[in-house]
A protein has these predicted regions:
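A contiguous loop/helix-start segment that scaffolds small-molecule binding in enzyme catalytic cores
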Residues: 2, 11-14, 77, 87-92, ...
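Class I S-adenosyl-L-methionine
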Residues: 2-24, 29-126, 131, 230, ...
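Signature of uroporphyrinogen-III synthase
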Residues: 22, 74-78, 211-363
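A glycine- and small-aliphatic-rich helix-loop capping segment at beta-alpha/alpha-beta transitions
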Residues: 32, 108-120, 136-143, 194-195, ...
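Short gly/pro/ser/thr-enriched loop/turn and capping motifs at secondary-structure boundaries
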Residues: 49-50, 68-70, 127-131, 148-151, ...
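Beta-strand->loop->alpha-helix junctions that form or flank phosphate-binding loops
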Residues: 62-65, 124, 201-210, 288-293
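Short, conserved phosphate/pyrophosphate- and ester-handling motifs at nucleotide-, phospho-/glycolipid
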Residues: 125, 181, 351
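Short, glycine-/small-residue-rich phosphate/pyrophosphate-handling segment
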Residues: 133, 137-155, 363
Length: 363
């Protein structure tokens, strides 16, 4: 109708993103890009602090828990949160540990969105069923040992029996990977032995895999529950049963790094933390970026203004940090200063990072 104003409602969208296991380096590139653009992030307990540090400060974070035996926010309520935020027109990332479609209830969360015609995408994550054994020197398949791998949830209601066909698993002769397996480990190992598995079959329980503090206990399937109790193995853990577990001593690689087992919190400004974080990560540390410093240049800097007005009186310009270089040249740019006025100066830089920053400005 002529003269009428049509109001277009903004359409929100949900991305179901698998965060992978603990190591932030295993997050997919697409997952990282989506986190950096998110307006709302709904996340589980198993998402590492290092990954959460990638989220913009202005994004809304909604914690929904979901550890074994502890679900503070019911699944139906999580579904409603996603729907409500999308209906507000927000870019919503639903961030789940591992892969969202492997025992992650991701399908349930998307069904409600589909019913309300909310657009969504799925970004697969690296599952702990593969990454955790790999970080412990256990290949889930090996030509000389097995040609199949089978992933089973070992989660059951408190006090309930496992609904697993143990005889069928024993007949498969492949590697068995049980997720959420700590509380049900004893029932699982006993069930396999009673179903005919060799009691001397190698098995391993892997705690907090891919993190700097990961631990493992390797034994036979009959002895593993007792040895795991003695080692005080806790959730989250992955249970592996199969001949490939015998390779862990030969193929273990994470324990050889100098900072293995160390967690490091970096409090530097977010824009300066990446290089140091990468170096620590390469040495085996688990790096958590927790910026506690925010650098803001003075709106007016009378001392710098005065120095620049008498720049011909100076012979040296010395910089002690990358930030100092950036603030200085930003100050010049905003005031449209002629850089040729600096041509007589000699420049000094403390540290290679500061020197490299000067090089970016042609110095």
């Amino acid at each position: 109708m002529e003269g009428a104003v049509v109001k277009m409602e903004k359409q929100g969208k949900v991305w179901l993103v698998g965060a992978g296991p603990s190591d932030p380096g295993l997050l997919t590139l697409k997952g990282k890009q989506l986190l950096e653009q998110a307006q709302v992030v709904v996340y589980d307990a198993l998402v590492s602090a290092a990954i959460l540090a990638m989220i913009p400060n202005d994004a809304e974070l909604i914690y929904v828990g979901k550890r074994a035996g502890n679900h503070p926010v019911p699944q139906d309520q999580i579904n409603q949160i996603l729907l409500a935020k999308a209906q507000e027109g927000k870019r919503v990332v639903r961030l789940k540990g591992g892969d969202p479609f492997l025992f992650g209830r991701g399908g349930e969360e998307l069904e409600l969105l589909a019913a309300h015609h909310i657009p969504f995408e799925v970004v697969p994550g690296i599952t702990s069923a593969l990454a955790v054994p790999a970080y412990n020197g256990i290949p889930v398949t090996h030509r000389d040992y097995c040609s199949s791998v089978h992933i089973i949830t070992a989660h059951s209601k408190k006090g309930g029996e496992l609904k697993i066909n143990f005889p069928a698993l024993c007949a498969l002769e492949g590697t068995l990977v049980f997720l959420m397996g700590v509380t049900s480990m004893e029932m699982g190992c006993e069930g396999l032995v009673k179903a005919g598995m060799d009691p001397q079959m190698p098995a391993a329980i892997l705690q907090e895999g891919t993190s700097a503090v990961q631990r493992r206990v390797v034994a036979t399937v009959s002895d593993l529950p007792q040895k795991a109790r003695e080692a005080n193995i806790q959730a989250p853990s992955v249970l592996i049963v199969g001949k490939v577990c015998a390779l862990e001593k030969t193929l273990s690689w994470t324990q050889n790094r100098p900072l293995d087992g160390v967690r490091v919190v970096l409090t530097r400004p977010k824009e300066l933390v990446s290089r140091m974080a990468y170096r620590l990560y390469e040495l085996g540390a688990e790096v958590i970026e927790l910026p506690a410093i925010c650098l803001e240049p003075y709106a007016e800097n009378p001392q710098l203004s005065k120095a620049l007005s008498h720049i011909s009186d100076y012979q040296w310009a010395a910089f002690t940090s990358i930030t100092g270089v950036r603030v200085f040249f930003d100050f010049l740019r905003k005031r449209r200063c002629d850089l040729r006025a600096l041509s007589h100066l000699r420049f000094a830089a403390i540290g290679p990072g500061t020197a490299k920053e000067l090089e970016q400005h042609g110095i």
